[in-house]
C-alpha cells in the first residue's frame, strides 16, 4: 500500500493536483468511477476485461488517495471491517446463503 500511496503522491505533486483532491472531491470521484465500473455490466455479463480492470483501478486509486489524504490506514480499516463482518456472518449460519445478518 505504501508504494501506491507514494506513486500517487508523486504523480499529483508533479501536476500540482493536490489542491483539487479534497476529501469531498475524492469521495465524489469514487462514486463516479464506481458508476463507470457498474456500466461494464449494464446489459449483460459479457464485459471487456481490460476496460473492467481500468475502471476497477480508478475506483481503487481514488480510495487509496482519499485514505492517504485523511490519514487513514486503508489496510487496517479493511481488515478491521472484515473481522466485524465475520462476526455478523458466522460460517455456521451464513455458509452458502445470502440472507442479511439480522435475519440469520
Regions found by a protein language model. Give the residues of each.
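Flexible "arm" and connector segments at domain edges
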Residues: 1-56, 60-104
Amino acid at each position: 500500500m505504501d508504494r501506491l500511496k507514494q506513486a500517487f503522491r508523486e504523480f499529483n505533486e508533479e501536476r500540482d493536483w493536490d489542491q483539487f483532491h479534497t476529501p469531498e472531491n475524492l469521495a465524489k470521484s469514487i462514486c463516479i468511477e464506481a458508476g463507470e465500473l457498474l456500466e461494464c455490466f449494464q446489459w449483460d455479463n459479457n464485459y471487456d476485461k481490460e476496460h473492467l480492470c481500468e475502471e476497477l483501478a480508478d475506483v481503487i486509486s481514488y480510495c487509496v488517495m482519499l485514505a492517504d489524504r485523511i490519514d487513514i490506514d486503508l489496510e487496517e480499516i479493511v481488515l478491521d471491517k472484515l473481522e466485524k463482518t465475520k462476526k455478523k456472518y458466522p460460517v455456521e449460519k451464513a455458509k452458502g446463503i445470502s440472507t442479511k445478518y439480522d435475519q440469520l
